[in-house]
Amino acid sequence: VFTAATIANRVNGCVNAPSLIQRVIKRCIEKGAAVNLDAYDKNRNLLYNSLKKFGFACIKPEGAFYLFVKAPVADDKEFCAQAQKHNLLLVPGSSFACPGYVRIAYCVSYEQIERSMPAFEALAKEYGLMK
């Protein structure tokens, strides 16, 4: 029950924008606020291309601000714990009803993603992903 409630909260509260947030966003757009989609595209490309180069399996997203990456071990929570030792914050896919995967957001600065690449490379080597 707890797991189901946690997933429902994440889906309803994080993935599907509540109506209040939608109204706030509408007002922001009407007042001229804009999102720099080029920055998200640049971040996505760096993260996706680097993870693929390091041997991680993932699909390039076409509209999200995060990647779902196949964990190199069956236990996605174990993989997230190991990544944390490299100062990488990944979310277990099982938290989104996608066990065996991890979610990595790229709605941060480009420089932060650049700085994380050595840690992702070390993690990939640790799991024997790099050829």
Feature-to-residue mapping (PLM):
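PLP-dependent class I/II
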Residues: 1-131
